[in-house]
């Protein structure tokens, strides 16, 4: 009883002082600047001296409220997402309770390192930045403890990019209490969406929490459901690609014998090659379930290549037939040989030249019709495939083998 009275007396005296006041038996002074339960750089030799509160035969129940205030820096090329969270941890520690009739204090605040706190680790975190380096816990007369932790973290996320730029992905933040077992500690988690800004490329349209089953250590998981607004990708990727394809079809209306047609087609092909090289760097890639846009733009490249090759081949065949017809002599009556030089600057073409030209133009016209029909059909086919296509990602290495991932029962 004496240590508890000494603890309460020191807690009440803190109202008139500025330093860390709650010290005594069973408490320790701060040893690191950051909270130990998220400090990845803390030496392994540092051991907790305060034991978890005893809740009898049942595990200690810690109620967790996760307030998500911002999600930003969604990088699909690095498969990372940054978020700002506020954690509210609540539990009951009867060792900190006092008689409210003798000490009429509604609540006291204690340093985080003066009492037991659950040691949490974010499994997917690359780094964690704390807004408050010295959080304080609020303790009620019944031993009810409230601890608020504000943090900014960057985590890994397995984006589902098959339908990019209209993709929807679930990003998980898994919190593990590795210093306790499920027989000692149990979490009950809730999530609240407090995001007020919608001016983002990726917006959070859903927020869920769950307790993963069959775990050896206590844990809870927060799932952020992200959806791409797609406006940037449509303007930067789809519009230029469709414009080049439409320009290529319009180029088929130029006469085959016009020298500008070959230059026009080659210029479009070279321009699309430059666009395609930058496109490959802008689109994400994955070991499985790559974006459908990668295949779509590859098909567009093949269509432009086929259209350019058709123009070059038919123009070459037409020119070769024209030269062969010019080189062969045309038999004419002797009386008409004197008048051959009076035909003017545009003499009548040889029959072989007309035949080769008409054959090439007919083939070009047929190819143009087939090409237009093929392009239109490919667009409808891709739209249907986009709507109905599904892809299941390959299992992660930690799930494919029995000994991988977190320990399971």
From Swiss-Prot:
Compartments where located: Cell membrane
Highest rank taxon of the organism: Eukaryota
PROSITE patterns, per the entry: NEUROTR_ION_CHANNEL
Residues in the signal sequence: 1-18
GO biological process: monoatomic ion transmembrane transport
Disordered: annotated span: 325-354
Key word Cytoplasm present: no
Regions crossing the membrane: 234-254, 266-286, 297-317, 366-386
Glycosylated position list: 55, 99
Cytoplasmic topological segments: 255-265, 318-365
Gene3D superfamilies linked: Neurotransmitter-gated ion-channel ligand-binding domain, Neurotransmitter-gated ion-channel transmembrane domain
Disulfide pattern: 157-171
GO molecular function terms noted in the UniProt entry: extracellular ligand-gated monoatomic ion channel activity; ligand-gated monoatomic cation channel activity; pH-gated monoatomic ion channel activity; transmembrane signaling receptor activity
Entry comment on modification after translation: Glycosylated.
Family matches, as InterPro entries: Neur_chan_lig-bd (IPR006202), Neur_chan_lig-bd_sf (IPR036734), Neur_channel (IPR006201), Neuro-gated_channel_TM_sf (IPR036719), Neuro_actylchol_rec (IPR038050), Neurotrans-gated_channel_TM (IPR006029), Neurotransmitter_ion_chnl_CS (IPR018000)
Function: Ligand-gated cation channel that allows the movement of sodium and potassium monoatomic cations across cell membranes when activated by zinc (Zn2+), copper (Cu2+), and changes in pH. Could also transport cesium.
Family (UniProt): Belongs to the ligand-gated ion channel (TC 1.A.9) family.
Name recorded for this polypeptide: Ligand-gated cation channel ZACN
Source species: Canis lupus familiaris
């Amino acid at each position: 009883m004496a240590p508890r009275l000494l603890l309460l007396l020191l807690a009440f005296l803190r109202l008139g002082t500025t330093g860390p006041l709650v010290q005594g038996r069973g408490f320790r002074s701060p040893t690191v600047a950051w909270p130990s339960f998220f400090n990845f750089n803390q030496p392994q030799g540092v051991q907790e001296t305060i034991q978890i509160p005893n809740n009898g035969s049942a595990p200690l129940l810690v109620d967790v409220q996760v307030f998500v205030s911002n999600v930003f820096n969604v990088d699909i090329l690095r498969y990372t997402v940054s978020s700002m969270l506020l954690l509210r941890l609540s539990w009951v520690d009867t060792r900190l309770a006092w008689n409210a009739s003798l000490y009429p204090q509604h609540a006291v605040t204690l340093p985080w390192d003066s009492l037991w706190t659950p040691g949490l680790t974010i499994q997917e975190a690359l780094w964690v930045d704390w807004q408050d380096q010295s959080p304080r816990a609020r303790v009620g007369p019944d031993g009810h403890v409230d601890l608020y932790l504000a943090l900014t973290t960057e985590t890994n996320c397995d984006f589902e990019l098959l339908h990019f730029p209209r993709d929807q992905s679930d990003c998980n933040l898994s919190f593990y209490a590795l210093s306790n077992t499920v027989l000692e500690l149990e979490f009950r988690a809730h999530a609240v969406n407090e995001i007020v800004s919608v001016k983002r490329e990726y917006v959070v349209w859903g927020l869920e929490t769950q307790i993963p089953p069959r775990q050896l250590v206590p844990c809870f998981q927060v799932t952020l459901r992200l959806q791409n607004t797609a406006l940037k990708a449509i303007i930067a990727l789809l519009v230029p690609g469709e414009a080049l394809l439409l320009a290529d079809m319009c180029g088929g209306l130029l006469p085959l014998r016009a020298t500008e047609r070959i230059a026009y087609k080659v210029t479009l092909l070279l321009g699309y090659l430059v666009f395609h090289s930058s496109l490959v760097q802008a689109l994400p890639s994955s070991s499985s379930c790559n974006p459908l846009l990668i295949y779509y733009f590859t098909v567009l490249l093949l269509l432009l290549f086929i259209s350019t090759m058709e123009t070059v081949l038919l123009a070459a065949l037409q020119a070769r037939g024209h030269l062969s017809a010019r080189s062969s002599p045309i038999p004419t009556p002797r009386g008409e040989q004197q008048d051959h030089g009076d035909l003017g600057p545009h003499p009548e073409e040889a029959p072989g030249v007309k035949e080769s030209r008409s054959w090439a133009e007919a083939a070009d016209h047929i190819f143009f019709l087939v090409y237009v029909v093929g392009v239109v059909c490919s667009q409808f086919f891709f739209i249907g495939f986009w709507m109905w296509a599904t892809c299941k990602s390959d299992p992660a290495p930690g799930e494919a083998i029995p000994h991988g991932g977190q320990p399971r029962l």
